[in-house]
C-alpha cells in the first residue's frame, strides 16, 4: 500500500513539474511567424508574365520548401491564382493539394483575388469573397477565415462589417506602416493586435504584420531581439510577423525558413509559432473573453501613399462600376425570366462574367497603379463581362416584355427597374420612328400624360426623355405618341454683362465668361454655395511633385495650391438642350493641344 502511495505522489510531482514547465512556456512572449509570397496580379508587368513566371515560381519553390522543412507553413491568397495553377501547372497543383490537406499550405484571404478595399461596391466585395470561398470548397474542401491584404491602399470602415457578415474572424496588413522617404511619420495602425469594429458594430480581429519581405539567415528566432522587442511593445506580449517576399511571388528564403524552424525548436525567451495567417485570430476566439484586446472604431486610410488611386486610370473605374451595376441588373432580370418559365437561369454564365472582371479589382489594377500594357488585358476582360451581362439582361427583359400588355395607341416603350425600391426618374430612351416628329406626347399605363422631351432624331431613331415611375424590380409600359406641335422651348441662359445666369425651381447658377461657376444659389434654403472669389472650375495642376509614381501619387501640398484656370483661348458657352425635363449647357475650352467639353 505504501508503494502505491509513493508511486501516486511521484506521478503527481512529475505532473506538477510538467504543468509548471508548460506554464513557463505559456508565459513566454509569442511570435506568430506568418510566411507569405505576396503576388501582384499585375503591376510593373502584365498578366502573361504573372502566369508564366511568378505563379510558377510560387508553386514550385514552396513545394520544395514544404518537402524539405517539416515545420514550414506557407500562406497564399487569391483564388484566381490557384485557378491558374490548376490550368497551367496541373502536376504541381495536385501535389499542392496534398499539403493543403495536411494544413501546411494554407489558403489565406478568402477572396477570388486580393481586392482594393475602397473603390469596389459592397456587393462586389462580398461577391469576391463568395467566389473565392466557393472555389476553395470545391477544389480543396476548405474555407478561409480571414481577410489577408498585406499590400493595399487603405481600408474603409465597412471592411470589418463585410468580413464579419461573411463569417470571417480576422484581418491583417502591413501597408499602413508605409512611411518611407519622403513620407516620414508614425504608423497609421492604431495598434499591432486588437479588435476592429465596423459601421454596424460588427467586429473582427486586426493584426499588423510588419514588412512582408522580412528575411533572416539561419538563426534561432527564439532568441531574436527584434521580435522580442515587438512582442514586448504590447500588453499581449505577442507579435504577428509576416516574412517572405512581396509583389513577385516566389517564396521565403531558405535561411528564413530554417530560422523559423530553429526558433520553433529553440529554448530562447521567445515562443516561436510557425503560423497560418488566421491562427492568432482563432487563438483569441471569442474576442469578448479577451478584454485586454484594444478596440478601434473607425476607418484606416492611407494619407501619404497611393493618394491618387481614385483618379488614375479612370476608365477602369468606369468599366468596373458599369459591371457591378449591370451584373446585378442582369441577375434580377434573369430570375424574373426563369420564374415565368421563359428561360433557364444562366448561373454559370453569370458567375464567369463576375469572375472575369472582379479579379481586376486587385489593388494594383482597379487602382490605376499598373503599367499601360497591363490595362490592355484589364479593359478586354471588363468589356467581355459587360457584353455577357448585357446579353443576359437584354434577353431576359425581352422575354418578360413579351408577356406584358403593350397594346397602346402609339409606340409601346417597356422600362425595367432593377432596384429594390420604386424609382421615379427621368429616363432617356431610343424609339424607332419612320419620320422625324415635331414633338412627342407620352402616357403612362393609366392613360395619364407625363412630362417628356424630344432630344434628337437621326436615321429613323428618336431620342427622348420620359419622367417615369417604375416599380421595384419591375416593369412599366409607356405609350409614346408623335404630335404635330413642337415643344415650347424654355428661356435660354440670361446674359448679364460678361456672365451668364440659368436657373430652375431649385438653383440659380451664374457662369463667368470662362465658364466657371461663380455663383450657385440654393433657392429653397436661400443659401449661396460658392464662396466669393472661389469659383468652381476645371482645375489644372502642373506641379505634382510625386517622387516615383506621378500617375497615382497626388501629394497634399499639390492639392493645397491654387489650381491653374484654363484660359488659353476663347471659351464657347452653348445651350445644347432646352426643355421641360432637362436643360444642358456645354462649355468648350482649350489648353495647349487639349480640348475640354463640360456639360452642366
PLM features: what roles do these ranges have?
Residues 347-351, 358-600:
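Catalytic and substrate-binding regions of extracellular carbohydrate-active enzymes
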Residues 125-153, 157, 165, 225-243:
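CE4/NodB-like, metal-dependent polysaccharide N-deacetylase domain
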Residues 7-15:
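Bacterial N-terminal signal peptides
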Residues 117-135, 210-231, 553, 558-562:
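Alpha-helical scaffold elements lining the catalytic groove of polysaccharide deacetylases
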Residues 21-128, 135-139, 165-169, 176, ...:
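N-terminal catalytic cores of secreted or lumenal carbohydrate-active enzymes
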Residues 1-4:
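Positively charged n-region of N-terminal signal peptides that target proteins for export
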Residues 95-103, 123, 156-215:
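Surface-exposed loop and adjacent secondary-structure segments within mature catalytic domains
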Residues 32-40, 190-407, 416-418, 465-467:
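Active-site and substrate-binding clefts of carbohydrate-active enzymes
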Amino acid at each position: 500500500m505504501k508503494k502505491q502511495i509513493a508511486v501516486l505522489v511521484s506521478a503527481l510531482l512529475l505532473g506538477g513539474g510538467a504543468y509548471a514547465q508548460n506554464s513557463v512556456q505559456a508565459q513566454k512572449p509569442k511570435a506568430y511567424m506568418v510566411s507569405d509570397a505576396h503576388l501582384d496580379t499585375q503591376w510593373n508587368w502584365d498578366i502573361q508574365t504573372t502566369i508564366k513566371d511568378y505563379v510558377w515560381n510560387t508553386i514550385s519553390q514552396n513545394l520544395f520548401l514544404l518537402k524539405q522543412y517539416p515545420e514550414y507553413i506557407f500562406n497564399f491568397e487569391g483564388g484566381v491564382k490557384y485557378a491558374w495553377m490548376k490550368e497551367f501547372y496541373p502536376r504541381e497543383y495536385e501535389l499542392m493539394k496534398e499539403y493543403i490537406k495536411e494544413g501546411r499550405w494554407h489558403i489565406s484571404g478568402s477572396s477570388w483575388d486580393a481586392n482594393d478595399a475602397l473603390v469596389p461596391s459592397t456587393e462586389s466585395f462580398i461577391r469576391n469573397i463568395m467566389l473565392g470561398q466557393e472555389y476553395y470548397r470545391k477544389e480543396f474542401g476548405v474555407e478561409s477565415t480571414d481577410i489577408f491584404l498585406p499590400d493595399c491602399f487603405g481600408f474603409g470602415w465597412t471592411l470589418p462589417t463585410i468580413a464579419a457578415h461573411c463569417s470571417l474572424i480576422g484581418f491583417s496588413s502591413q501597408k499602413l506602416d508605409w512611411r518611407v522617404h519622403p513620407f516620414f511619420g508614425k504608423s497609421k495602425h492604431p495598434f499591432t493586435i486588437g479588435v476592429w469594429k465596423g459601421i454596424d458594430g460588427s467586429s473582427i480581429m486586426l493584426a499588423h504584420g510588419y514588412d512582408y519581405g522580412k528575411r533572416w539567415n539561419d538563426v534561432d528566432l527564439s532568441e531574436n531581439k527584434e521580435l522580442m522587442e515587438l512582442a514586448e511593445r504590447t500588453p499581449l506580449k505577442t507579435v504577428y510577423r509576416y516574412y517572405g517576399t512581396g509583389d513577385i511571388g516566389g517564396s521565403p528564403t531558405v535561411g528564413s525558413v530554417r530560422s523559423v524552424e530553429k526558433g520553433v525548436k529553440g529554448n530562447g525567451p521567445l515562443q516561436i509559432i510557425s503560423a497560418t495567417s488566421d491562427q492568432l485570430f482563432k487563438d483569441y476566439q471569442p474576442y469578448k473573453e479577451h478584454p485586454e484586446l484594444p478596440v478601434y472604431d473607425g476607418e484606416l486610410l492611407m494619407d501619404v501613399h497611393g493618394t491618387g488611386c481614385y483618379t488614375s486610370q479612370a476608365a477602369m473605374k468606369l468599366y468596373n462600376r458599369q459591371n457591378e451595376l449591370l451584373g446585378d441588373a442582369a441577375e434580377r432580370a434573369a430570375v424574373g425570366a426563369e420564374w415565368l418559365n421563359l428561360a433557364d437561369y444562366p448561373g454559370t454564365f453569370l458567375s464567369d462574367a463576375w469572375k472575369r472582371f472582379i479579379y481586376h479589382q486587385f489593388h494594383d489594377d482597379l487602382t490605376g497603379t499598373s503599367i499601360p500594357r497591363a490595362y490592355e488585358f484589364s479593359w478586354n476582360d471588363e468589356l467581355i463581362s459587360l457584353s455577357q451581362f448585357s446579353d443576359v439582361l437584354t434577353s431576359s427583359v425581352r422575354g418578360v416584355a413579351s408577356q406584358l400588355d403593350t397594346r397602346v395607341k402609339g409606340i409601346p416603350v417597356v422600362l425595367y427597374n432593377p432596384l429594390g425600391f420604386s424609382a421615379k426618374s427621368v429616363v432617356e430612351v431610343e424609339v424607332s420612328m419612320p419620320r422625324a416628329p415635331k414633338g412627342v406626347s407620352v402616357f403612362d399605363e393609366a392613360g395619364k400624360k407625363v412630362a417628356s422631351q424630344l432630344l434628337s432624331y437621326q436615321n429613323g431613331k428618336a431620342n427622348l426623355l420620359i419622367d417615369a415611375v417604375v416599380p421595384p424590380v419591375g416593369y412599366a409600359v409607356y405609350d409614346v405618341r408623335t404630335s404635330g406641335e413642337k415643344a415650347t422651348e424654355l428661356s435660354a441662359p440670361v446674359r448679364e454683362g460678361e456672365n451668364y445666369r440659368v436657373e430652375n425651381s431649385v438653383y440659380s447658377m451664374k457662369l463667368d465668361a470662362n465658364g466657371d461657376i461663380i455663383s450657385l444659389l440654393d433657392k429653397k434654403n436661400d443659401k449661396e454655395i460658392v464662396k466669393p472669389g472661389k469659383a468652381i472650375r476645371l482645375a489644372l495642376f502642373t506641379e505634382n511633385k510625386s517622387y516615383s509614381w506621378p500617375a497615382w501619387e497626388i501629394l497634399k501640398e499639390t492639392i493645397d495650391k491654387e489650381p491653374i484656370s484654363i484660359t488659353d483661348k476663347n471659351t464657347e458657352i452653348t445651350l445644347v438642350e432646352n426643355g421641360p425635363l432637362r436643360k444642358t449647357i456645354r462649355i468648350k475650352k482649350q489648353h495647349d493641344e487639349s480640348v475640354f467639353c463640360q456639360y452642366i
